[in-house]
C-alpha cells in the first residue's frame, strides 16, 4: 500500500466517526434528564461500572467526575463478584456502560443492585438487553457504524459512549456554575494546575517573609536566613525594599560576619 493512502484512510475513519457522533442528539431526552437529576441528588456514592472497552470508558468518565468535584469511583464488575460488591450500598448510584448491554460479567452486579434497591443508570445500544432491563434509568445509545474495515471493532461506539459521559459531566458543571477556581482545588498538578496557578498561591508573605532593617548587621542577616530557610533576606529601609541578600552573598562576605558592620 502506498504510504500516501495512510492519510486518506485516517481521514476517512475520522470523518465517519464525526458523522456517527452527531447521533448523540438522540440521547438528549427524558432519560438523560433523569440521569442528571439522579447524579446531582445522589445521597450515597456514585459508582461506575463496565467491562472491556466499556470499562475503560467508565473509568475515564469517573475520573472526569471526580476532577470536577463530583466524587465517584470505578468498580470492576468481575472483581465485584469476588468480594468487591461490599463497596456498593443502598443509597449509592450505579452508572454502568455496555455497548451490547448483554455482557455476562455484569449479571451478578445487576442482580445485587436489584435485590437491594440500588438505583442503576444503564447505558447500552440494545433496548431489550440484560443491562437496560435491570436499569431504573435507561439511556439507549443510537446504533453507529464502526470506522474499522470489519465494522466490528469498537471505534465509533466507544467514542459515542465517551461523549455521552462528558455531556453528563459538563451539564452538571454548567448547572453548578463550575469555575476555574473550583477546578484548581481538584486539579492542582500537571499543566492544567500550572495554568490555573496564581501568584498568591505560591507567594510568601507576612511573618514567613525574611526581612531585616538596613541598619542591622551581617550576623543578624545570617540568623534570619537560617530561620526562614529561603536562602535570602529582604533588606528594608524605612519600610521600603532596599535590596536582597542571598546566602551566597553572605558566603562571599564572610570577612564581615565577625564584625558589627551595618548592611547599609
Locate predicted features.
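The conserved cystathionine-beta-synthase
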Residues: 211-229, 254
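YjeF_N-associated NAD(P)HX repair module
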Residues: 154-202
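Short, compositionally biased "basic patch" segments
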Residues: 1-12, 51-59
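Tandem CBS (Bateman) regulatory domains
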Residues: 181-207, 242, 246-264
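An N-terminal, well-structured beta->alpha segment
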Residues: 5-41
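Terminal peptide-recognition signature
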Residues: 17, 50, 95, 168, ...
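Glycine-rich phosphate-binding loops that contact phosphosugars or nucleotide phosphates
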Residues: 41-163, 167-173
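Short hydrophobic beta-strand segments in globular cytosolic domains
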Residues: 236, 241-242
Amino acid at each position: 500500500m502506498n504510504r500516501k493512502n495512510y492519510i486518506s484512510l485516517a481521514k476517512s475513519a475520522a470523518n465517519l466517526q464525526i458523522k456517527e457522533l452527531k447521533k448523540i442528539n438522540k440521547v438528549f431526552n427524558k432519560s438523560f434528564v433523569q440521569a442528571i437529576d439522579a447524579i446531582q441528588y445522589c445521597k450515597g456514592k456514585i459508582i461506575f461500572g463496565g467491562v472491556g472497552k466499556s470499562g475503560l470508558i467508565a473509568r475515564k468518565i469517573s475520573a472526569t467526575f471526580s476532577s470536577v468535584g463530583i466524587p465517584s469511583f470505578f468498580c470492576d464488575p468481575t472483581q465485584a463478584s469476588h468480594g468487591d460488591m461490599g463497596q456498593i450500598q443502598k443509597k449509592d448510584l450505579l452508572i454502568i456502560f455496555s455497548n451490547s448491554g448483554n455482557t455476562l460479567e455484569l449479571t451478578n452486579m445487576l442482580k445485587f443492585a436489584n435485590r437491594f434497591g440500588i438505583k442503576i443508570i444503564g447505558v447500552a445500544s440494545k433496548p431489550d438487553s440484560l443491562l437496560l432491563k435491570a436499569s431504573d434509568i435507561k439511556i439507549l445509545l443510537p446504533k453507529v457504524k464502526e470506522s474499522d474495515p470489519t465494522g466490528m471493532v469498537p471505534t465509533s461506539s466507544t467514542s459515542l459512549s465517551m461523549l455521552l459521559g462528558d455531556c453528563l459531566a459538563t451539564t452538571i458543571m454548567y448547572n453548578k456554575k463550575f469555575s476555574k477556581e473550583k477546578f484548581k482545588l481538584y486539579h492542582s498538578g500537571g499543566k492544567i494546575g500550572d495554568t490555573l496557578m496564581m501568584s498568591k498561591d505560591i507567594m510568601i508573605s507576612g511573618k514567613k517573609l525574611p526581612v531585616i532593617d538596613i541598619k542591622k548587621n551581617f550576623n543578624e542577616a545570617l540568623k534570619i536566613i537560617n530561620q526562614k530557610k529561603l536562602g535570602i533576606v529582604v533588606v528594608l529601609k524605612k519600610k521600603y525594599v532596599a535590596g536582597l541578600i542571598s546566602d551566597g552573598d553572605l558566603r562571599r562576605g564572610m570577612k564581615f560576619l565577625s564584625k558589627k558592620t551595618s548592611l547599609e
